[in-house]
């Protein structure tokens, strides 16, 4: 019997997409589901950015774009990095891709050889280990749990490094936890990295603008780290442009050339119209970014307050992104008389089927004691969702 390739059979399906699909199926049946499983802003793309895209269509930006992205967009990204992050990159050190997910995948595929190790702190974004496996690498998971605010320590990093370690993947602000590494914490990690030759860090900074003011720092800022860091970012979260599919890497030119070679065979250049919209996003008025940041901060404060009022949940206050990652293990082994909760996946399914609130179990993110809720939704939805959760959890004995 014909089968799919071995490399594909090693991959797990996306748990976040599976839960979102289950939620959509229930909604199609007329069930009032509040979907807090989705990792995207609920805002519309700002009108000036949409107008820039319409202008690009009228100006006939309808042909293949250069594989690394339009020069004007790469220049706009370089200026953004200088202006906001105090990092100097040339356009030749920037590669634009079809979303930050492709940027991550390009980097892993370009740098990781068969059998080489990639250190990934857990909790992690669900796709990181799968991308490493796809590249033939070995994910090395470092547990950074609730008690340490979901952040890997330099001692843990040092202990995980072997002669076969090629890369570390670091996401700050974090999906799924909302944790943010401070400048001092990043510097301590950088000092460990710099002690080891040919060791790189993929710094996923896609949530950089969704933080408490002044919280975001880049690991590339420290002496010697620009040569070791691959920054991944994009327009999806900051500008509510998830569907436009524009991400990028900023990295040493030799790495960018390698990723460009790979991208040239996979997809070629990103969508021409999306690139012009992204260019305007970076050079235009940034007030929309601050407006959305303030909305997420208000929602964060609301959901934290309500979650802390639910007996049995333990809550760390997220400093960035738009996720709450509470500890739910106190409910394991409990039952409402029909359903028994054995793990975080059971817990999330119970909330969906009985409370009609979609979330994602922490098993998918490498932390079996917690679950993820996105608060990228209205205040009204947050209040109602937390009411439902509190009500159905009270039935577990």
Locations of regions flagged by a protein language model:
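PLP-dependent class I/II
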Residues: 2-4, 12-14, 19-22, 26-33, ...
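Conserved N-terminal alpha-helix of the aminotransferase class I/II PLP-enzyme fold
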Residues: 64-97
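Flexible nucleotide-interacting loop at or near the entrance of a catalytic core
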Residues: 61
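Substrate/cofactor-recognition hotspot
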Residues: 8
